From Swiss-Prot:
Membrane topology: Peripheral membrane protein
Subcellular location as annotated: Cell membrane
Protein known as: Aliphatic sulfonates import ATP-binding protein SsuB
UniProt superkingdom: Bacteria
Gene: ssuB
Subunit structure: The complex is composed of two ATP-binding proteins (SsuB), two transmembrane proteins (SsuC) and a solute-binding protein (SsuA).
Record GO terms (molecular function): ATP binding; ATP hydrolysis activity
Organism: Bacillus subtilis (strain 168)
Length: 255
């Protein structure tokens, strides 16, 4: 397995009160899989992603990537945030290379290959201020892929983009996934996006965050949002998502 996750509990203590964010999370993600995570606000999706990334180690449980325990950030995990977080004083190719020497022929070759993959050929010397939001996010994706991570973690990477750019970048991401065969885990609030991208989909419930439903998406790529099969799966996901909201209301009301 590429990623195995076993979290008994992740909790915060605030003003003497314990707030359990995640509880009894068990996931096994195969190499090359594209898992999408969806759930209501406050269900711990982003917290789970940070735990897998090694950015949060204060929990009861374990995370392994190809048999190695995750205790801190490392080159085996790539992380993409909603904001691109590019360095404004660096060009596109310099941002992708980050702390590696762009004058090294091997580094330059990898950077050039990634620029081609994320469809930014011709913009190598541009600065972030000269890029659109979608272009900036493509630079961030290329930067995360430079060290060839075993798992790419994406925390709502297209959430701040307009609908047209968002759909375009979804196709770019799928193209990268097919070419690089990198295991991907993407957090989203968008049901359409979760069905369009993932070959496996996990729905979380909140308070505390738990896996409500794990669903394989048996649709061939490339996917067409207008087909009856796509719409049927989307409706199933929506129905399960609505159940998590009903559960939250019932538990909060003591029903």
């Amino acid at each position: 397995m590429a990623v195995t996750i076993s979290i008994k509990e992740k909790a915060f203590v605030q003003e003497g009160r314990k707030n359990t964010v995640l509880e009894n999370i068990e996931l096994s993600i195969a190499p090359g899989e594209f898992l999408t995570l969806i759930g209501p606000s406050g269900c711990g999706k982003s917290t789970l992603l940070k735990i897998i990334a090694g950015l949060d180690s204060e929990y009861d449980g374990s995370v392994e990537i190809n048999g190695r325990s995750v205790t801190a950030p490392g080159i085996q995990q790539g992380f993409i945030f909603q904001e691109h977080r590019l360095f404004p004083w660096l060009t596109v190719e310099q941002n992708i290379a980050a702390d590696l020497n762009l004058k090294d022929p091997k580094v330059k070759q990898k950077v050039d290959e990634l620029i081609e993959i994320v469809r930014l050929k011709g913009s190598e010397k541009a600065y972030p201020r000269e890029l659109s939001g979608g272009m900036s996010q493509r630079v961030a994706i290329a930067r995360a892929l430079l060290r060839e991570p075993e798992v790419l973690l994406l925390d709502e990477p297209f959430g701040a983009l307009d609908a047209f750019t968002r759909k375009h970048l979804q196709d770019v991401l799928l193209d990268i996934w097919r070419k690089k065969k990198t295991t991907m885990i993407l957090v989203t609030h968008d049901i359409d996006e979760s069905v369009y991208l993932g070959n496996e989909l996990a729905i979380l419930k909140a308070k505390p965050g738990k896996i409500h439903k794990l669903m394989p998406i048996h649709l061939a790529y490339p996917r067409n949002r207008t087909t009856p099969d796509f719409q049927a799966i989307r409706q199933r996901v929506l129905s399960e998502f609505e159940k998590t909201e009903d559960l939250e209301y019932a538990e909060g009301s003591g029903i």
